[in-house]
UniProtKB/Swiss-Prot annotation:
Stretches assigned to coiled coil: none
Protein species of origin: Bifidobacterium animalis subsp. lactis (strain AD011)
Oligomeric and partner information: Part of the 50S ribosomal subunit. Contacts protein L29, and trigger factor when it is bound to the ribosome.
Keyword presence, S-adenosyl-L-methionine: no
Task performed by this protein: One of the early assembly proteins it binds 23S rRNA. One of the proteins that surrounds the polypeptide exit tunnel on the outside of the ribosome. Forms the main docking site for trigger factor binding to the ribosome.
PANTHER family in alphabetical order: 60S RIBOSOMAL PROTEIN L23A (PTHR11620)
A single GO cellular-component term on record: ribonucleoprotein complex
Protein name: Large ribosomal subunit protein uL23
SUPFAM superfamilies: Ribosomal proteins S24e, L23 and L15e (SSF54189)
Molecular function terms, GO-annotated: rRNA binding; structural constituent of ribosome
Keywords assigned: Ribonucleoprotein, Ribosomal protein, RNA-binding, rRNA-binding
GO biological process: translation
GN (gene name): rplW
Record family assignment: Belongs to the universal ribosomal protein uL23 family.
């Protein structure tokens, strides 16, 4: 199967800023919201291209959007695909401004 090349910024949408992702950054793992149709190889190549680091592992997870109540009835939050990226030892990505 041939991977379709997409621009890196179309694959990596934004970093996840939370207490859990901040704690994982101490272990060299960084969490990003990615395009729903992106695969692990594309995510790895995009991170290496954008941040100039060596990626050793990529874990992905799909988060279903929650049902929310609105004034007029019920709605849904957007589904998200997240990637937890592990970088090589001694390298880091500065997404928290440290």
């Amino acid at each position: 199967m041939v991977a379709i090349h997409k621009p890196a910024h179309d694959i990596i949408l934004k970093p996840v800023v939370s207490e859990k992702s901040y704690a994982l950054s101490d272990m060299g793992q960084y969490t990003f919201v990615v395009a729903p149709n992106a695969n692990k190889v594309q995510i790895k190549q995009a991170i290496e291209e954008i941040f100039k680091v060596k990626v050793t592992n990529v874990n992905t997870l799909n988060r279903a959007g929650k049902r929310t109540r609105t004034r007029t009835g019920y709605g849904r939050r957007v589904n998200q695909k997240r990637a937890i990226v592990t970088v090589a030892e001694g390298q880091s990505i500065d997404i928290f401004g440290n």
